[in-house]
């Protein structure tokens, strides 16, 4: 891979990269190979990535981080976890090195390799729903759940229409649409492996968001109890 290399203490020469076919929202693998082409040792640098649209605008700027150490002239061969962007579609994937809270090496004039990537819908075939026996689902409940999973969400929850008032379930009243900032656990969720319910709300199985697993609450996904 031929590209210009800036003079200075922090410079990188990209040698190559490989990427597993990504799915929206799912963890995949990549492999990057690069050299420390500068005069300074690398300490406290991380290799990461950006997901961009076709005009170079950031969709996901802060990818997962992986620490790298290298002396001047040393080669790094590193496997990375890469989480696919949401929703599926055509993106650009850019790799870069970052000195946290200071700068990305691209800001110092370093080359950033970019590749055009088709991000596939997420495989939702293994999704599991956690519902009580007396739950009545709206006719489009399963269709909406599947659509959210294939968009890339590991955990999907919706609204609950209760026959008897239950204070704990008031935040789940059926109104609105998708809410990525929903402040409560997902009750009676649909989860992709390896996720499992990790809490109960009003005696019902629920999942409280944890880690970086993508999730969505959609009030249009409605069930009755």
Question: What role is predicted for each listed range?
Answer:
Residues 2-24, 114:
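Low-complexity, acidic Ser/Thr/Pro/Gly-rich terminal tails and inter-domain linkers that flank the onset
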Residues 11-14, 46-66, 109:
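Short beta-strand and strand-turn-strand segments in soluble, beta-rich domains
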Residues 34-38:
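Asparagine-centered strand-capping/turn motif at beta-strand->loop junctions
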Residues 83-89:
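Short, surface-exposed loop/turn segments at beta-strand-coil junctions that are enriched for proline
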Residues 101-112:
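Beta-sandwich strand segments
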Residues 126-136:
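Short beta-strand-to-loop acidic/aromatic patch adjacent to the donor-nucleotide binding site
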Residues 140-171:
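Conserved donor NDP-sugar-binding/catalytic core segment of glycosyltransferases
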Residues 174-194, 198-205, 211-225:
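A recurrent flexible, glycine/aromatic-enriched loop bordering the glycosyltransferase active site
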């Amino acid at each position: 891979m031929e590209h210009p290399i800036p003079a200075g203490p922090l410079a990188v020469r990209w040698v190559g990269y490989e990427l597993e076919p990504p799915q929206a929202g799912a963890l995949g693998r990549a492999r990057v190979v690069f050299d420390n082409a500068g005069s300074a040792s690398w300490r406290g640098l991380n290799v990461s990535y950006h997901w961009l649209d076709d005009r170079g605008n950031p969709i996901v700027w802060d990818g997962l981080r992986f620490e790298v150490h290298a002396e001047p002239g040393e080669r790094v061969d590193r496997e990375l976890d890469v989480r696919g962007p949401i929703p599926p579609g055509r993106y650009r994937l850019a790799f870069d090195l970052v000195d946290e809270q200071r700068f990305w090496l691209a800001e110092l004039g370093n080359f950033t390799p970019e590749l055009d990537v088709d991000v596939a819908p997420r495989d939702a075939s293994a999704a599991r729903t956690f519902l009580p026996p007396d739950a009545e689902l709206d006719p489009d409940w399963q269709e909406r759940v599947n659509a959210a999973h294939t968009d890339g969400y590991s955990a999907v929850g919706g609204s609950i229409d209760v026959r008897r008032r239950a204070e704990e379930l008031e935040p789940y009243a059926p109104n609105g649409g998708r809410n990525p900032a929903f402040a409560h656990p997902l009750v009676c969720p649909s989860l992709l492996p390896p996720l499992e319910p990790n809490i109960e709300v009003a005696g019902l199985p629920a999942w409280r968001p944890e880690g970086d697993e993508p999730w969505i609450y959609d009030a249009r996904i409605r069930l009755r109890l």
